[in-house]
Regions:
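A short hydrophobic/aromatic micro-motif that marks alpha-helical segments and, especially, helix-coil
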Residues: 53, 62-65, 69, 77, ...
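Hydrophobic transmembrane alpha-helices
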Residues: 1-51
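Short helix-perturbing small/polar motifs within transmembrane alpha-helices
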Residues: 9, 13, 62, 67, ...
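Interfacial aromatic-anchored transmembrane helix boundaries in multi-pass membrane proteins
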Residues: 22-39, 66-104, 137-142
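Transmembrane alpha-helical segments of multi-pass membrane transport proteins and ion-pumping complexes
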Residues: 15-23, 76, 80, 96, ...
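Membrane-helix interface segments
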Residues: 4-7, 55-65, 85, 111-116, ...
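Generic transmembrane alpha-helix motif of multi-pass integral membrane proteins
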Residues: 39-64, 102-106
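Membrane-embedded alpha-helical hairpins and interfacial helices in multi-pass inner-membrane proteins
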Residues: 35, 85, 89-90, 108-176
Length: 176
């Protein structure tokens, strides 16, 4: 698959930003004592990539869903390697793919003023994917008891990441 150099450089920049955010966030202790809870701020970069209207007018070709998916997968794989949390890779990849799929589907029905909602839905499905992996790996369906708590926290954190992406896009469009 051929990717033009400018587009590839833009994707690499987004991966680097997401990795930096992910790595910094991994070092910050979470104030909520619930296993699996974190802000997931690196997802703001995924949302940004999914919604940003790059294009010929900005001298970068528009990112396709496949391009954004590549950014997500690179961030998850490299993030697991950089932080040394390889065990969490399976949780992240399952949650990331499920959350991304939900975000791609929802993108068709929202405007740029509702990216926060896409962030919330993505976080919910991310948590569902992680719980499914936990149940599969442990054989303990009782783990699903965490799901309502993770969904509530996920809505909150998803709104935050969605708003971060939404405001970033708005600001970049204003200065372009």
């Amino acid at each position: 698959m051929y990717i033009p150099v400018k587009k590839l450089a833009f994707m690499a920049t987004l991966i680097a930003i997401a990795l930096a955010i992910f790595t910094i966030e991994a070092q910050i202790p979470v104030p909520i004592p619930i296993p699996g809870v974190k802000l997931g701020l690196a997802n703001a970069v995924t949302l940004f990539a999914l919604f940003f209207k790059s294009g010929k007018e900005r001298d970068v070709e528009k990112l396709t869903v496949a391009n954004v998916f590549m950014i997500l997968i690179c961030r998850i794989v490299l993030g697991a390697m950089f932080t040394g949390r390889v065990v969490s890779f399976m949780y992240s990849i399952a949650g990331g793919i499920l959350g991304f799929s939900a975000q791609v589907l929802m993108k068709q029905f929202v405007s740029h003023k509702q990216i926060w909602a896409v962030g919330a839905v993505g976080a919910i499905f991310h948590n569902i994917g992680q719980i499914a992996v936990a149940i599969f790996l442990t054989g303990a369906p009782v783990i699903a008891v965490y799901l309502p708590i993770l969904i509530i926290v996920g809505i909150f954190t998803g709104i935050i990441t969605g708003l971060a992406a939404q405001f970033s896009i708005k600001r970049l469009e204003e200065i372009s």
